[in-house]
Design a protein with these regions (language model features):
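A short, surface-exposed interaction/processing loop segment used at functional sites
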Residues: 98-146, 162-215
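Short, non-transmembrane alpha-helical segments in secretory-pathway proteins
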Residues: 2-75, 117-139
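Intrinsically disordered, low-complexity regions
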Residues: 13, 37, 42, 159-161, ...
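Exposed beta-strand-loop-beta-strand "reactive/processing" segments of non-cytosolic proteins
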Residues: 44-107, 151-158
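Phenylalanine-focused residue identity feature
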Residues: 23-26, 42, 61, 78, ...
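Glutamate identity and glutamate-enriched acidic tracts
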Residues: 2, 6-11, 25, 40, ...
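Generic signature of intrinsically disordered, low-complexity segments enriched in small/polar residues
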Residues: 26-29, 45, 62-67, 93, ...
């Protein structure tokens, strides 16, 4: 029986293969249909669809989330409550520059690319992952709180202390989160790492407000 880590590695490998296949097909279709142009609202950061010929699928990561009920009434710490969604996202790069993300999900038992986009998120995320990640980024988790429209990068320390978080642009905007400058090391302050307690109240309020809007 595979361990949870081995299962994630197998899942990641299968999802990566699907992302690569899907992107190759996407590039062929876009060049065939729109060569020499760029359709309005194109999901990736290129100036011409021909640029896609030089783009590739880079690394991927699973998407985690926290149940809104656990945010409103915490039963544990933020990290412990995070669970995988079953969705993977893969960074797409061109000339070593992020141009967007591919979203991959398992549908009827088969991994498939379901969407492209997130050009701004890809740049924000890649910069933070390079700054905070170890060699294989195994110390990082991407956590999306759907009901607060907020994304966080969890950064686990190597010494077993409580993980800290880098709020991504969506979280910085939605929660009016300021970069940490009074706590942690100089490197932490520069990278914008905060404790979960520093955004818990704002996150709870955002989730509560958004859930109320759907009633």
């Amino acid at each position: 029986m595979q361990t949870p880590l081995q299962l994630q590695q197998t899942e990641g490998s299968d999802a990566s293969a699907a992302a690569t296949r899907g992107f190759a097909e996407f590039v062929r279709n876009q060049i065939q249909a729109h060569a020499g142009t760029l359709p309005e609202g194109f999901p990736l950061d290129v100036t011409d669809v021909q640029d896609l010929k030089d783009a590739r699928i880079a690394y991927g990561f699973p998407v985690y989330t926290v149940n809104p009920k656990d945010i409103l009434t915490p039963r544990s710490d933020f990290s412990s409550m995070a669970r995988p969604t079953g969705v993977w996202r893969f960074l797409i790069s061109r000339d070593n520059r992020p141009i967007g993300l591919a979203t991959v999900e398992k549908i009827n038992g088969t991994w498939q690319t379901t969407s492209y986009g997130g050009a701004g998120l890809s740049k924000d995320l890649d910069a933070l992952m390079q700054f905070h990640g170890n060699a294989n980024r195994s110390n990082l988790r991407f956590i999306r709180i759907f009901q607060a429209r907020s994304d966080f990068l969890e950064v686990a320390s190597g010494n077993g202390t409580t993980p800290r978080f880098a709020p991504l642009q969506s979280a910085r905007e939605a929660l009016l989160q300021q970069r940490a400058s009074k706590t942690g090391s100089a490197a932490d302050a520069a990278g914008g790492l905060v404790d979960a307690s520093q955004f818990a109240e704002s996150l709870r309020a955002a989730v509560q407000a958004n859930l109320a809007n759907f009633r």
